[in-house]
């Protein structure tokens, strides 16, 4: 029996799947902001969530065959981690806003709002899930970087200078931008 398309995950790797799930959960939480605060916070939060998932997907698509591949993949994973840190900071700012009036964040199917205590509990549960997802993503990215380092050291590549690394990164960056 096959899995329906809407239930399929984009990849079989944990760090890619977790990035996708994290992006989805962050966007759901950001959509709970009121219209006034959504104009300020929602677009950057959605952008950072998408960027961190995109960088993970790009890094996943690189199979390490050469020094260039290793450097590019490492750079993409570090950019994903940087976007993850910025996303976490921005999301915490938005969460402070949500906690100022939690009853307006969630509404029932009939359109009425939850009480403040119910809404606070719902927000706490959602934040707990997000916190574990963030921690897991940090751990997974660190694990991928460590395993890439081990593979790189096993292959015994020639020592490459910092200038060559910069040239490789700049060329790959512009190649990614113009594709």
List each model region and its residues:
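Amphipathic alpha-helical assembly/interaction segments
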Residues: 1-179
């Amino acid at each position: 029996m096959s899995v329906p398309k809407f239930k399929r995950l984009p990849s079989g790797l944990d760090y890619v799947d977790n990035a996708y799930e994290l992006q989805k959960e962050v966007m759901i939480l950001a959509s709970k902001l009121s219209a006034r605060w959504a104009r300020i916070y929602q677009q950057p939060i959605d952008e950072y969530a998408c960027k961190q998932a995109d960088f993970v997907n790009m890094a996943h698509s690189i199979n390490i065959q050469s020094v260039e591949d290793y450097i590019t993949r490492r750079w993409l994973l570090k950019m994903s981690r940087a976007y993850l840190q910025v996303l976490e900071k921005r999301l915490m700012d938005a969460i402070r806003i949500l906690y100022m009036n939690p009853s307006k964040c969630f509404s029932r199917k009939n359109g009425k709002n939850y009480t403040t205590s119910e809404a606070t509990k719902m927000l706490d549960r959602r934040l707990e899930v997000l916190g574990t997802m963030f921690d897991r993503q940090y751990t997974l990215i660190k694990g991928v970087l460590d395993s890439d380092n081990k593979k790189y050291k096993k292959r015994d590549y020639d020592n490459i200078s910092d200038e060559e690394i910069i040239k490789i990164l700049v060329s790959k960056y512009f190649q990614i931008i113009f594709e």
